[in-house]
Swiss-Prot record:
GO molecular function terms attached to this record: ion channel inhibitor activity; toxin activity
Organism encoding this protein: Conus bullatus (Bubble cone)
Family annotation (Pfam families): Conotoxin (PF02950)
Name of the protein: Conotoxin Bu3
Domain notes: The presence of a 'disulfide through disulfide knot' structurally defines this protein as a knottin. The cysteine framework is VI/VII (C-C-CC-C-C).
């Protein structure tokens, strides 16, 4: 009986610890994955060229695959 109580209490404590740390790291984990992907993409041995974005007001086009820093208005053909 004592062993069962100790087991239940320990499971509850571990669950509470996981829930409290999960809230703190929710956004940080996403940023870590983004940084890891960018680091891999921009490394010299990846075989990929680093992407540069086109600034606001510059021309963008679907066919040329221009990459705007924010968003491309394809109707007007400019980065917004």
């Amino acid at each position: 009986m004592k062993l069962m109580c100790v087991l239940i209490v320990s499971v509850l404590v571990l669950t509470a610890c996981q829930l409290s740390t999960a809230d703190d790291t929710r956004d940080k984990q996403k940023d870590r994955l983004v940084r890891l992907f960018r680091k891999k993409r921009d490394s010299s041995d990846s075989g990929l060229l680093p992407r540069t974005c086109v600034m606001f007001g510059s021309m963008c086009d679907k066919e040329e695959h221009s990459i705007c820093c924010y968003e491309c208005d394809y109707k007007k053909g400019i980065c917004v």
